[in-house]
């Protein structure tokens, strides 16, 4: 993939969240603020495109051009109903 495009990982999961990481090209990465997480408006402003619900949840200090995202895994409808 060209170095001048935003790259998106496949999604990966645990029991509470789905995750993905986004790799920013160098010209975009230099625009990100240091030492804090980005709001949805900020990462969308950088050109990151994802569906609703994703949150920038952690900094990867060795590689600050990699943004780490997660969102809650929706509960299956069957587990929402209470059957006594």
Swiss-Prot record:
Keywords for the protein's UniProt record, in alphabetical order: Cell cycle, Cell division
Coiled coil: none
Gene3D superfamilies, sorted: Cyclin-dependent kinase, regulatory subunit (3.30.170.10)
Disulfide partners: none
Gene Ontology BP annotations: cell division
SUPFAM superfamilies: Cell cycle regulatory proteins
Pfam families associated with the record: CKS
GO MF annotations, alphabetized: cyclin-dependent protein serine/threonine kinase regulator activity
Similarity comment: Belongs to the CKS family.
Oligomeric form and interacting partners: Monomer in solution; may form a homohexamer that can probably bind six kinase subunits.
Xref: PANTHER family: CYCLIN-DEPENDENT KINASES REGULATORY SUBUNIT/60S RIBOSOME SUBUNIT BIOGENESIS PROTEIN NIP7
Known role: Binds to the catalytic subunit of the cyclin dependent kinases and is essential for their biological function.
Name of the protein in its database record: Probable cyclin-dependent kinases regulatory subunit
Organism: Physarum polycephalum (Slime mold)
